[in-house]
Curated annotation (Swiss-Prot):
Role, per record: Participates actively in the response to hyperosmotic and heat shock by preventing the aggregation of stress-denatured proteins, in association with DnaK and GrpE. It is the nucleotide exchange factor for DnaK and may function as a thermosensor. Unfolded proteins bind initially to DnaJ; upon interaction with the DnaJ-bound protein, DnaK hydrolyzes its bound ATP, resulting in the formation of a stable complex. GrpE releases ADP from DnaK; ATP binding to DnaK triggers the release of the substrate protein, thus completing the reaction cycle.
Family: Belongs to the GrpE family.
Biological processes annotated in GO: protein folding
Record keywords, A-Z: Chaperone, Cytoplasm, Stress response
Known partners and oligomeric status: Homodimer.
Protein name, entry field: Protein GrpE
Organism per entry: Trichlorobacter lovleyi (strain ATCC BAA-1151 / DSM 17278 / SZ) (Geobacter lovleyi)
Length: 181
């Protein structure tokens, strides 16, 4: 039996079944079919709305990730450059002691250029100056110093500068903190 014959037979069987049904029964049967199709349409609509919401959430997440990559993608580069900056600062401190003005001037210029370049990318130093209130979100306490010369819980000395990339902490300032006796 081919496809056309099967379809014709199915239609004939359905016609026989509906011919045997009263008009009220046919109405009930049609209402049931309509309700089933309406439920299927509602389910499909809900599925479409969920898929749209998923797509919108994906777009937002992708946009956020792209923005973070643009803002913080240089993090590893900056982390590699910071020790160079530290060594330049140490060289400046020791060169002043030896009185080598030309060397000091050259290192100062290099230091300034490096700081300017880092600022262009949103890198700035954390305030770890003497007298600044200790903040564990930005400072790492390396030592506590008992002293009455400084207010309690303030920075006495900065061992290594901390840095921020935009608003994100790259590394904390390493400091000693005052503790009143």
């Amino acid at each position: 039996m081919n496809k056309e014959q099967q379809d014709l037979q199915t239609e004939q069987e359905a016609a026989v079944e509906t011919a045997e049904l009263t008009p009220e029964q046919q109405l009930v049967q049609l209402q049931e079919k309509l309700a089933a199709k309406e439920q299927e349409a509602k389910d499909n609509w809900d599925k479409l709305l969920r898929e749209r919401a998923d797509l919108e959430n994906y777009r937002k997440r992708a946009s956020r990730e792209k923005e973070e990559l643009l803002n913080y993608g240089i993090k590893s580069l900056v982390e590699e450059v910071l020790p160079v900056l530290d060594n330049l600062e140490r060289a400046l401190e020791h060169a002043n002691e030896d009185g080598l003005p030309a060397l000091v001037e050259g290192v100062k210029m290099t230091h300034t250029l490096l700081q300017t370049a880092l600022k262009k990318f949103g890198v700035c130093a954390v305030d770890g100056n003497c007298g600044t209130l200790f903040d564990p979100a930005f400072h790492q306490a390396m030592a506590q110093v008992e002293t009455s010369d400084h207010p309690n819980n303030t920075i006495v000395q900065e061992f290594q500068k901390g840095y921020l990339l935009k608003e994100r902490l790259l590394r904390p300032s390493m400091v000693s903190v005052a503790k009143n006796p």
